[in-house]
Swiss-Prot record:
Function summary: Plays an essential role in viral DNA replication. Binds the origin of replication and cleaves the dsDNA replicative form I (RFI) and becomes covalently bound to it via phosphotyrosine bond, generating the dsDNA replicative form II (RFII). In turn, viral DNA replication initiates in the presence of host Rep and DNA polymerase III at the 3'-OH of the cleavage site. After one round of rolling circle synthesis, protein A is linked to the newly synthesized ssDNA and joins the ends of the displaced strand to generate a circular single-stranded molecule ready to be packed into a virion.
Zinc finger (unnamed): 246-268
Protein name: Replication-associated protein A
Gene Ontology MF terms: ATP binding; DNA binding; DNA ligase (ATP) activity; endonuclease activity; zinc ion binding
Active-site residues, Swiss-Prot/TrEMBL: 343 (o-(5'-phospho-dna)-tyrosine intermediate), 347 (o-(5'-phospho-dna)-tyrosine intermediate)
Transmembrane segments: none
Any one biological process term the GO annotation gives: rolling circle single-stranded viral DNA replication
Record field: catalytic activity: ATP + (deoxyribonucleotide)n-3'-hydroxyl + 5'-phospho-(deoxyribonucleotide)m = (deoxyribonucleotide)n+m + AMP + diphosphate
Organism of derivation: Enterobacteria phage phiX174
Family listed: Belongs to the microviridae Rep protein family.
EC number: 3.1.21.-, 6.5.1.1
Keyword terms: ATP-binding, DNA replication, DNA-binding, Endonuclease, Hydrolase, Ligase, Metal-binding, Nuclease, Nucleotide-binding, Viral DNA replication, Zinc, Zinc-finger
């Protein structure tokens, strides 16, 4: 009906099959979701999904509905005039939305490259005050598919909860947690290499500030933005400058195991310490202080405890800060600079916290004196927060072959503890290289996708529940160092991210949190 603008069997003569076959490995490794970040392909996918949903809703609404001489009949029964009028009004609006999407299609030339930003022809500009690119972006932002479902009362069907869905959900959550931890550990590694200051902080919520915190949906964003501006000020830069190059953060929510009290663990990475940051042990006979006074009063919703992360040859030591001692006056035990990363990572992996987070506030577990107040507050799910592109920095891949990039998307954890970061960076590099491929070629070369949940449910009948997890794992075998090319091995060695290399580095660097 409207899918004719996509390649199909009737277009087969227009495609160079050798070229399409050559593209398939890179497109499969990169993935359509990554490639859809390119403007032209992204807009095609956006419009396709929007049209499919609107057509589906229209078809659903018209089931059993007939019109005769201005009267409406539903399953043979005549509808009241007010019901008919409302139905017609809503249906007309639905069809207007469809027509709007149909008007965009002629502006999306599938023979153009996927990185092209469509502007529109003369007719488009006569009818619209913005380019096709601006129109599509505004439509996606102001009219998401969820809003369409809500307005037309067409919710998504709830999935069946069974052993397969639970296994898949657990596997997805495990992968997400693993990716977050990899980004944290890579950021620690990079901060050490670049000589940045690392500060660990715990943010609590005071009883009298709970309501203010929950009333402000941007409380955490504003806090980290303020810290970023403090770093900018210390570098003599404007407050409205981007602080991405001088400040980053990683924040994990935790619900206390005793009574479910919400607090946050944050790691700040700063190229320059905020103005007024001085060694808390300067002039003291017992050097047992670790907190940064310059950051102590920046959290407006409770108590914070910003502590300098110390290790041999850290940025604090190079700035002349004294090495702190413990309560007994003994120098702090030296451990790897990665220790703080592992310390924060345990909160990412803490399953009891994930269970409480799924309930929202964990209000029932919070102490009894606050139960009434909490019942008046909106339920809210707090997730791990981090700076944009946090921990994603890797050695450039611009000179690597496509074959090498494909291998980097398939590496296992045994080859490098940063395999998921490598995968995303390799996919991004491939997306840039595929930018000059046409939309038609990408759509023709895209692999046939398998519904993993349906496949698992079909497989369970043959292999049984007990063997399902290992069977699924065997389907996604990862490459080891012995499986990859010399080019890929050389890249890992040069980047210093092989498991062996990272073990050596952890021995080189002493320190403690």
């Amino acid at each position: 009906m409207v899918r004719s603008y996509y390649p199909s069997e009737c277009h087969a003569d227009y495609f160079d099959f050798e070229r399409i076959e050559a593209l398939k490995p890179a497109i499969e490794a990169c993935g359509i979701s990554t490639l859809s970040q390119s403007p032209m392909l992204g807009f095609h996918k956006q419009m396709d999904n929007r049209i499919k949903l609107l057509e589906e809703i229209l078809s659903f609404r018209m089931q059993g509905v007939e019109f005769d001489n201005g009267d409406m009949y539903v399953d043979g029964h005549k509808a009241a005039s007010d019901v008919r009028d409302e139905f017609v009004s809503v249906t007309e609006k639905l069809m207007d939305e469809l027509a709007q999407c149909y008007n965009v299609l002629p502006q999306l030339d599938i023979n153009n490259t996927i990185d092209h930003r469509p502007e529109g022809d003369e007719k488009w500009f006569l009818e619209n005050e913005k380019t096709v690119t601006q129109f599509c972006r505004k439509l996606a932002a102001e009219r998401p598919l969820k809003d369409i479902r809500d307005e037309y009362n067409y919710p998504k069907k709830k999935g069946i909860k069974d052993e397969c869905s639970r296994l898949l959900e657990a596997s997805t959550m495990k992968s997400r947690r693993g990716f977050a931890i990899q980004r944290l550990m890579n950021a620690m590694r990079q901060a050490h290499a670049d000589g940045w200051f690392i500060v660990f902080d715990t943010l609590t919520l005071a009883d009298d500030r709970l309501e203010a915190f929950y009333d402000n949906p941007n409380a955490l964003r504003d806090y980290f933005r303020d810290i970023g501006r403090m770093v900018l000020a210390a570098e003599g830069r404007k407050a409205n400058d981007s602080h991405a190059d001088c400040y980053q953060y990683f924040c994990v929510p935790e619900y206390g195991t005793a009574n479910g009290r919400l607090h946050f663990h944050a790691v700040h990475f700063m190229r320059t310490l905020p103005t007024g940051s001085v060694d808390p042990n300067f002039g003291r006979r017992v050097r047992n202080r670790r907190q940064l006074n310059s950051l102590q009063n920046t959290w407006p919703y409770g108590y914070s405890m910003p502590i300098a992360v110390r290790y041999t040859q850290d940025a604090f030591s190079r700035s002349g800060w004294l090495w702190p001692v413990d309560a007994k006056g003994e120098p702090l035990k030296a451990t790897s600079y990665m220790a703080v990363g592992f310390y924060v990572a345990k909160y990412v992996n803490k399953k009891s916290d994930m269970d409480l987070a799924a309930k929202g506030l964990g209000a029932k577990e919070w102490n009894n004196s606050l139960k009434t107040k909490l019942s008046l507050l909106p339920k809210k799910l707090f997730r791990i927060r981090m700076s944009r592109n946090f921990g994603m920095k890797m050695l450039t891949m611009t000179n690597l072959s496509t074959e090498c990039l494909i291998q980097l998307t398939k590496l296992g954890y045994d080859a490098t503890p940063f395999n998921q970061i490598l995968k995303q960076n390799a996919k991004r590099e491939m997306r840039l290289r595929l930018g000059k491929v046409t939309v038609a070629d990408v759509l023709a070369a895209q692999p046939v996708t398998t519904n993993l949940l349906k496949f698992m449910r079909a497989s369970i009948k043959m292999i049984g529940v007990s063997n399902l997890q290992s069977f699924i794992a065997s389907m996604t075998q990862k490459l080891t160092l012995s499986d990859i090319s010399d080019e890929s091995k050389n890249y890992l060695d040069k980047a210093g991210i092989t498991t062996a290399c990272l073990r050596i580095k952890s021995k080189w660097t002493a320190g403690g949190k």
